[in-house]
């Protein structure tokens, strides 16, 4: 449908195999988190406001993964920043929630502006913002003098959204959000958008030394630092937050290798991470709800008092550790 005819922009959906997989992750895990939130939130929490923000957040995610042109993608990209701000700060009486929400909004919105500038450069080189035409113009874009600034701006936007070094600091502060928000944010929602963007534009921007060093190096540093920081966390959600940073760093490293096989591995791990991280966050929320603490130094014997939750958490943790067949 015509969106901004004067600029030659059309509102369109791109329903290729990659988009279908992402849409299933966004809606499938979103549906499970909605069910979980129904029983997790207390009667004192304003549920209509929560579910309105959450469903709008989910719709914005779908808008990004199904976008048929780059301007449309950036619009929904910024909407995810807005609704994540409202969800992270849902318990606005908590100063930590307000601080985490502001930090997430500032970092990701600034990255969104960088992405917008990069998209404008890509559109100028390709002569169109339509994703089909952009993906077909990879050789033209890589040969253009504007390729390097466009690449750096797009990568900057992706790194801020996926909490990659040196922009990783906002994600642990977002753990002040309700657990359903954390589960969705880490597994199928906003922090995945950066690596999803790099995957979507991989045919256009990859294949150069600039791509390998800007993407691969940032991912490698994030992968190592995230894993190191996770070892010293005592809060369950904090530990999972840093593990998310590390896993996204691993995905980013794979994308930076300029290898089609590494791209396939990155997409597979994206799906795997979405599944086990949602499970682990919901298990952490159940443990906190029943025991009153997320401090792992004070938790023991859960396999006896919460056998179902403990079993689900162990299976998800085994998947995170890369145990075969999981």
For the regions a language model picked out, list residue spans one by one.
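Hydrophobic transmembrane alpha-helices and their helix-loop junctions in integral membrane proteins
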Residues: 32-48, 54-73, 82-326
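Short phosphate-coordinating micro-motif centered on Lys-Gly-acidic
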Residues: 78
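Membrane-interface loop-to-helix entry segments
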Residues: 14-31, 106-107
